Amino acid sequence: MSAADEAAYGIRAFTERFYTVVLGRYPDAGGFDGWVAGLTAGTLSGGDLASGFFLSPEYTGKNKSDSAFLDDCYQAYFGRAADAGGKQGWLDALAQGMTRTEVLDGFSGSQEFIALAESYGIRPFSGYGSARVAREADGIPIPVFPIPLFMLLAGLLGWLGLSRFRLGS
């Protein structure tokens, strides 16, 4: 199998996982092909795909509990069950007002998801790497943070109990 075939297979497998885990069904041809084309072209990131599935009327209409939502996140994003401590941290954050969209952003920015997405040749989230590439092209070294700085700040504020100062909505 050529490298291009392997990359195409990986993107298809990545997309199919979100259909089966998040929506609980096999993909429809039109939707599946659209997601795969966007990921292949780089116009969509893995985080875009994940948000599209988790925020879709099909998923939100299931009215899943926060616990079930997090179980789905761990399976879809990481391909594994939630660890007790990590899941409890997310449950606490949701109980204190964090939105599910913010949770999805946190999963998309995690080292585990970044590594997984990159292994499929997929950009983990919108804007990932773009500033670094542009600055390095100009010969300007920049620091690289393993997690986007705004996500670290949002997590720190939540940890400090200052959730009323949330970033975004």
Question: Which residue stretches match the model-derived regions?
Answer:
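Short, threonine-centered small-residue motifs that mark membrane-proximal processing/anchoring sites
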Residues: 134-151
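Substrate/cofactor-recognition hotspot
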Residues: 1-137
